[in-house]
UniProtKB/Swiss-Prot annotation:
GO annotations of cellular component type: plasma membrane
InterPro entries: UppP
Signal peptide annotation: none
Topological category with respect to the lipid bilayer: Multi-pass membrane protein
GO molecular function: undecaprenyl-diphosphatase activity
Origin superkingdom: Bacteria
Official protein name in the record: Undecaprenyl-diphosphatase
Species, as recorded: Acidothermus cellulolyticus (strain ATCC 43068 / DSM 8971 / 11B)
Recorded family membership: Belongs to the UppP family.
Record-listed E.C. numbers: 3.6.1.27
BP GO annotations: cell wall organization; peptidoglycan biosynthetic process; regulation of cell shape; response to antibiotic
Zinc listed as a keyword: no
Length: 276
């Protein structure tokens, strides 16, 4: 993993992590185009660790929201009158929504790292979840905000988030679509998607960090560069997406997703890239 590769992958991670286009799909495609073996330990560990840059960007961007929720959650542990406050409950909902992907990610880590790294899975995920995004947008009521959230909503969104372990689905695409299906408006669904991303991706990055540092082909310098680039570009991406969803439908991303899928199929069938 050289410096140029680290910069390129870091930028791709940051730009795409929170957009409903699948960062894993874009990273896998970029790795294949650069001649990397997409299921190699060095590659999978590197991409997992640089996610921490994107997550740090989310933490910085939503620092006031996070401080409010965490403070209310801890107060709710010791004060009965705080336990039912909207912010304390939101803390519990983030925890509940994180549990499904935490269990699935840990129990299925070998399948995720190897069996699901094929570009054909990327194509399937991009196309099939594009249909789900269109369906969610066209059938959603979009009348609720985060203060209307209940435990079944959080669990449902968390379960749908598990599908994002398949490259091409998109974690944000899955969770925002699920939020829309539960009747939340786009901004509320997107904000909860960001909050839900923080514990899940931070845990994945920390879990992979020790392996990445000790893996041949991954230097600490490349990890720092990739993570730094992911942070900078993710911060800008978050700010842009929140403004975008306030006035535009997620279906605007569908044509892009389908175009990427068509490109990957063409690249695979012509031998430009290999599936794994």
């Amino acid at each position: 993993m050289n410096g140029v590769s680290a910069v390129v992958l870091g930028v791709i991670e940051g730009v795409t992590e929170f957009l409903p286009v699948s960062s894993t799909a874009h990273l896998t495609i970029a790795e294949a185009l650069m001649g990397m073996k997409t299921d190699a330990p060095a590659v999978t560990a590197f991409t997992a660790v640089i996610q921490m840059g994107a997550i740090l960007a989310a933490i910085v961007y939503f620092r006031r929201d996070i401080r409010t929720v965490v403070t209310a959650w801890f107060r709710g542990l010791v004060r009965a009158d705080e336990r039912r406050s909207p912010d304390a409950l939101l803390g519990w909902y983030v925890i509940a929504g994180t549990i499904p992907i935490g269990l699935a990610g840990y129990l299925g880590r070998n399948v995720i790292k190897h069996d699901l790294r094929s570009l054909w899975y990327v194509v399937a995920g991009l196309v099939l979840w594009s249909i789900a995004i269109v369906y969610a947008e066209r059938t959603a009521a979009q009348r609720r905000d985060l203060r209307d959230m209940r435990l079944p909503d959080a669990v449902f969104i968390g379960v749908i988030q598990v599908l994002a372990l398949v490259p091409g689905v998109s974690r944000s695409g899955a969770t925002i679509s699920a939020g829309l299906r539960q009747g939340f408006d786009r901004v509320a669904a997107t904000r909860f998607s960001f909050l839900l991303a923080i514990p899940a991706l931070l845990a994945a990055g920390i879990f992979e960090l020790k392996d990445a540092v000790g893996t041949s082909g991954v230097s600490m310098a490349s990890l720092v560069v990739g993570t730094g680039m992911a942070f900078l570009t993710a911060y800008a991406s978050i700010a842009w997406l929140l403004r975008f969803v306030a006035h535009h439908s997620l279906t605007n991303f569908v044509w892009y997703r389908v175009t990427v899928a068509v490109f990957v199929v063409a690249a695979l069938t012509t031998g430009l890239v290999h599936a794994v």
